[in-house]
Curated annotation (Swiss-Prot):
Organism: Escherichia coli O139:H28 (strain E24377A / ETEC)
Functional note: Catalyzes the reversible reaction in which hydroxymethyl group from 5,10-methylenetetrahydrofolate is transferred onto alpha-ketoisovalerate to form ketopantoate.
Free-text cofactor note: Binds 1 Mg(2+) ion per subunit.
Gene encoding the protein: panB
Protein family: Belongs to the PanB family.
Enzyme class: transferase
InterPro entries, per the entry: Pantoate_hydroxy_MeTrfase (IPR003700), Pyrv/PenolPyrv_kinase-like_dom (IPR015813), Pyrv_kinase-like_dom_sf (IPR040442)
Subcellular localization(s) per the UniProt record: Cytoplasm
Cofactors: Mg(2+)
Pfam family of the protein (one): Pantoate_transf
Protein name: 3-methyl-2-oxobutanoate hydroxymethyltransferase
Length: 264
C-alpha cells in the first residue's frame, strides 16, 4: 500500500472528495484502521481524557504523545500520522521545534498546534525546518479555562471574521492542514472555501474537506457527556470493522455529519 501523504489530502480537496480521519492511540486500533483503509490518524492530546482518565487535555506531556505516536506508527506504517503538541509545549517557536522533533522522531508526519495569529512565527519556524504543521481553530481544548468550558466558537460576525483571519494567517505562514472544531456550519464553509489547504472538521458540519472523530466517540465507548457532533457507528453495525467502514462511507458521501450533529 502506498503511503498516504499531505499531497493525498490536497488532491482530495481539489477533487472535492471528502475524507475521514480518526484519533488513534495504540498499535492494535491503528492496525485495524489501516486494514480498513482509514489512513489518516491523529495521536491527539485527547488521550489525556480517553486513555489516562483526566478531566481535560492539560496534563498530557510531550513524552506521552511520543509514546503513543510510536505505537500507532508500528500499527499503521503507511498512514499519514498527525501528533498534537500538548499544552505548554509550544510557548515559543524554539520550544515548539524541540518538542516537534521529539514527536517526529517517534513517527509523526506532522504536528498539530492550537491557536491563531499568535502562532505565525512558530508555524514559520517549524515549516522552514521541515516540520509540517496542522493548525487548529475554533474550540481549542487546551484553552478550556479561557473559554469557560467546551462551547461553540465563532458565532457572530466579529468572532467569525477573527477565525477566518486566523485561518488565513496560519495558511500564509506555511500550515498545510487546518482542524476546525465546534464552529457554525456557515463559518466552516467560509473558511474551507477561502483556504487552499484542506480543512478537517469536528463539529463543523459536512462542508469541510474532511472529518475527524475521537475514536471513543465514534464507537460509543466514552463515558459521560456525548458531544452533539458525535455518532456511535458501532451501535448501528455491531462490528467494529464494519463501524469503521460505515464512518468512512458516511463522511465520503456527506451523510455524516448531518444536521443533528451541526451548529449554527
Amino acid at each position: 500500500m502506498k503511503p498516504t501523504t499531505i499531497a493525498s489530502l490536497q488532491k482530495c480537496k481539489q477533487d472535492k472528495k471528502r475524507f475521514a480521519t480518526i484519533t488513534a492511540y495504540d498499535y492494535s486500533f491503528a492496525k485495524l484502521f489501516a486494514d480498513e483503509g482509514l489512513n489518516v490518524m491523529l495521536v491527539g492530546d485527547s488521550l489525556g481524557m480517553t486513555v489516562q482518565g483526566h478531566d481535560s487535555t492539560l496534563p498530557v506531556t510531550v513524552e506521552d504523545i511520543a509514546y503513543h505516536t510510536a505505537a500507532v506508527r508500528r500499527g499503521a506504517p503507511n498512514c499519514l500520522l498527525l501528533a498534537d503538541l500538548p499544552f505548554m509545549a509550544y510557548a515559543t517557536p524554539e520550544q515548539a521545534f524541540e518538542n516537534a522533533a521529539t514527536v517526529m522522531r517517534a513517527g509523526a508526519n506532522m504536528v498539530k498546534i492550537e491557536g491563531g495569529e499568535w502562532l505565525v512565527e512558530t508555524v514559520k519556524m517549524l515549516t522552514e525546518r521541515a516540520v509540517p504543521v496542522c493548525g487548529h481553530l475554533g474550540l481549542t481544548p487546551q484553552s478550556v479555562n479561557i473559554f469557560g468550558g467546551y462551547k461553540v466558537q465563532g458565532r457572530g460576525d466579529e468572532a467569525g471574521d477573527q477565525l477566518l483571519s486566523d485561518a488565513l494567517a496560519l495558511e500564509a505562514a506555511g500550515a498545510q492542514l487546518l482542524v476546525l472544531e465546534c464552529v457554525p456550519v456557515e463559518l466552516a464553509k467560509r473558511i474551507t472555501e477561502a483556504l487552499a489547504i484542506p480543512v478537517i472538521g469536528i463539529g463543523a458540519g459536512n462542508v469541510t474537506d474532511g472529518q475527524i472523530l475521537v475514536m471513543h466517540d465514534a464507537f460509543g465507548i466514552t463515558g459521560g457527556h456525548i458531544p452533539k457532533f458525535a455518532k456511535n457507528f458501532l451501535a448501528e453495525t455491531g462490528d467494529i470493522r464494519a463501524a469503521v467502514r460505515q464512518y468512512m462511507a458516511e463522511v465520503e458521501s456527506g451523510v455524516y455529519p448531518g444536521e443533528e450533529h451541526s451548529f449554527h
